[in-house]
Design a protein with these regions (language model features):
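Conserved helicase motor core of P-loop NTPases
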Residues: 1-82, 93, 201
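C-terminal accessory regions
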Residues: 74-78, 86-204
Length: 204
């Protein structure tokens, strides 16, 4: 469902670019709808040349991940030498497999060169954790919620996720998970009408 929303339904209905304008946000890294699995699936769906690039040796690998030209990636630690920072998102524009080099273009049009050792600073960013999304905004946000996320289903996490979307927010998954997230406030109280609005559309 998440892949179809990102690849087809949202772009077709709202004219939003799947690669540059839609961000999947998920509470966890490991699960069927965690960042690791969603990035694997979304990369395969949104980069149709992935299999060919792998067969022809036109990709780079780092920590079990495959990078190809066009990939959406996130810097996951501060790198003062390259002037890139934890949470910066960009797109792979060039790969040199013989030299083990990759170029990433960031939002401000800067192009940053990574060698094979520096690739460990990058992760695929088709899906990112809600925590990593703090401080960012996206045209459209897709948030999968399941009971696999049970320990993390809190109102403040849901609030962070849905307030990242500027134009469109899509919640997809188990209504029971959404009900729990609305109900569980944890230690943080926010005075917004989000919980009331979500309760109004949830089946009782």
């Amino acid at each position: 469902m998440v892949t179809r929303l990102v690849r087809e339904r949202i772009p077709q209905r709202f004219g939003i670019n799947a690669l540059t304008d839609i961000q999947v946000l998920t509470p966890m890294h490991r699960s069927e709808v965690g960042t690791e699995e969603l990035n694997r699936v979304l990369q395969a769906e949104l980069q149709p040349h992935l299999a060919t690039a792998e067969a022809e040796g036109r990709l780079l690998r780092s920590r079990g991940r495959r990078f190809v030209v066009g990939d959406k990636v996130m810097q996951v630690r501060n790198d003062y030498d390259r002037d890139v920072w934890n949470g910066d998102v960009g797109f792979v524009t060039a790969i040199d497999t013989e030299e083990g080099l990759m170029v990433v273009r960031y939002d401000d049009e800067r192009e940053v060169l990574y060698d094979e050792d520096a690739l460990e600073q990058l992760e695929l960013a088709y899906a990112v954790s809600v925590h990593k999304s703090q401080g960012s905004e996206y045209k459209a946000v897709v948030v999968p919620l399941t009971l696999q996320h049970y320990p993390l289903l809190r109102r403040n996490l849901l609030y962070t996720a849905v307030t990242r979307g500027k134009q469109l927010v899509v919640l997809v998954g188990d209504p029971r998970a959404l009900r729990r997230a609305v109900r569980e406030s944890g230690d943080l109280t926010r005075y917004t009408r989000l919980a009331l609005r979500l309760r109004a559309i949830l089946p009782s």
